[in-house]
Amino acid sequence: HNPSYVTKGYKMVNDVKPGGVFMINCQWDFEELNHHLKADAKRYIARNNIQLYTINAIDLAIEIGMGKRNNTILQSAFFSLAKVLPEEDAIRFMKEKAKASYLKKGQDVVDMNYKAIDLGATAYKKIDVPAEWADAVDEPDTRELKGKPELVKMVKEILEPVGKMDGDSLPVSAFAEHVDGQFELGASAYEKRGVAVSVPTWDANKCIQCNQCAYVCPHATIRPFALTAEEAKNAPEAAKIVDVKAGKGKGTYQFTMAISPLDCMGCGVCIGVCPVNALSMVPQEGELAQQDVFNYCVAEVSEKKDMQDNTVKGSQFKQPMLEFSGSCAGCAETSYARLVTQLFGDHMYISNATGCSSIWGGPAATSPYCANKEGHGPAWCNSLFEDNAEHGLGMYIGQNKIRQDLAEETRQLIAVEWARPELKAAAQAWLDTMEDGEANAEPAKAFVKALEDSICTVDELAAVPQFAEHAAELKAKGALFCDCAACTIAADLLSKKEYLAKKSMWIFGGDGWAYDIGYGGLDHVIASKQDVNIFVFDTEVYSNTGGQASKASNIGQVAQFAAAGKTIAKKSLAEIAMTYGYVYVAQVAMGANMNQTLKAIAEAEAYHGPSL
C-alpha cells in the first residue's frame, strides 16, 4: 500500500505463492515501475507466474476528498482480485459497513466511502510481466557510507538487514559488540525510508524566515540554515537561497530552508503552522533533488553561533539532536523532545520511561538521538516502566558524585606549586562555573585542553638536565608520562573528562508513567530536591498500549477502559508538585504558545532543583 516498500527493496512479494496476485499502490507508469522494482522482486514475479497489478489509490483518494485515507479503495480492490467471496457481496457488505460507521458524520461522508468502494473495484491495472524479468540482475551498490567507523559498521551489519525486514537472517555474532545494549548514536540518519507520498516544498520568496515550521516539525526534516557567501556558492544547483531578510545575520549571511524528502513523514504540520503559506505539499518524487541540498547543509554548512538564541527563530539554527525518529507522522512528543535537545543536547542525560517515547527514542540499532560534529550528544537510557524517575535520579547522583570528586582533585591540582599558571587559571574557571550548565561548557573544554597540554612526557622530562636521571628510571619501567603530582592528577582528571561538563539531566515519560504507574517514584524524586528535570508527554491516555484511560484522562473522555466516558476528573499533577514549595512547575503547549514553551524549558534547566 506504500510505494516506499518497493523502492526500499522490502521482500514483500516473496510471501506470494506461485500463481498468486501481487498489487502495488503507486503513481507509476510501467517505465517507472520497471525502474523502481528491485531485481530480486522481478525475478520472483517472473519465475513464479505472479499476477502483477498496480492501482493509484493515492491520487484517487485525494480526488474524491478522502485525503491520505486510501484504505477503503485498496480493500475494495483486494476483494475484487482475491475472489474470497463473490465481488457483488463484498461490495454490498462494505457499503453496509460504511453506512453503519459513518452515517453519524453525514450522508456526504457515506457517499464518499461508497465512491471509494466502487473505484477500488475497477481502478486497478494488470501489468504484463516481461520475460526478461526472470533473469533481472541487481545493479552494484556503489554507495559510500560516511560517518564514524563504528556507526557505519553497525549500519551495514545490523541496521540495513533489519530495515529490509531481513533481521531474522542475522547471526548472533552480528551483535557481539552490542552485548551490553549500547548502540551508536545517529543511526536513523542512514535509513532514508522515503515513506511520505507528499512532502513540503518551500517558496523562498513568500517565506518570512520565522522558522516556525522547523520549530514544530516532529522529525527534524525541515531545517533553516544561515550560509556564508562561500557556502552558498558551493551549494547544489537545486538549492533555493535568499538573503537573510531581517534581524541577526542581515547583510552577513544568506538563508535556505532545507527539506529532507526521504526522511519526511508527510504529516503536514509545517504547512499548517506557516503564517504566509510559504510551504505546500507536492509529490515526493518531484522533490528528490532537495535531498542533496539537505545533505549538503547538514554536512558542509557551519553552525552560526551569532544566529542562535533561545527564541523561536534563533533556537532553530541550533542542531537538533533528535532526528528522523520512528514516531507516528505528526507526533507532538518528538517535537518537544527535539526542542530540548536543541537547547541542551550536547551535555544532556536522558532517562526514559517505557512507552511511546522509548519506542521512538531507543529502537535497537536505529537511534534517532545523534551527536554533533565534536561527537557530543545526549546519553539515553531506558529502565523499567515504573522506576524511571528513580533511575534518572540515580544517573544524576552518580555523575554528581564523580564531579564532586573531580572538583576535589582539581583543588589539589591548583595547590601544586609547580603546576602551570595557565592550567591553574583554567582549573579555577571550571570550578567557578561547575554548577551552571550553560556557563560551564566552554570552561570545561578549556580545562580539558589545558590538562592535555600540561602533562609532561618522559622524553620531555629527559630534556631537562636535573630530571634526566628520573626520566631514565621511568622509561625503564615503561612509563610514558611524568609521575609528579601535577601530571598524575591531570592524567586522572583526563581519564574522566566526559564528566567535567555540567550535565543537563532529563527524565522523559508519558502520563501512564507519571500520573499512574510511576507516580510514587516521581513524587519521591521531586521531594529529593535534586537538580533534575522531568518532562511528561501528557497525551491523556496510555498511548503506546492502545489508548487506555489514565489519571491524566479528562472527565467524560471516551477511551479504552472508559467506553462510557471517564467518571472522575483529571489528576492535577502540577498542583500536587507545587505543594512542595521548591519544585519548578510549568505546563506547555507549543501549538498554543511557542515562546512560553521555550521560556519554561529554559527556566526548568536554569533552576537548581527539581523541575516538572
Language-model region placement:
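Ferredoxin-type iron-sulfur electron-transfer modules and their immediate structural context
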Residues: 90, 103-264, 271-349, 354-445, ...
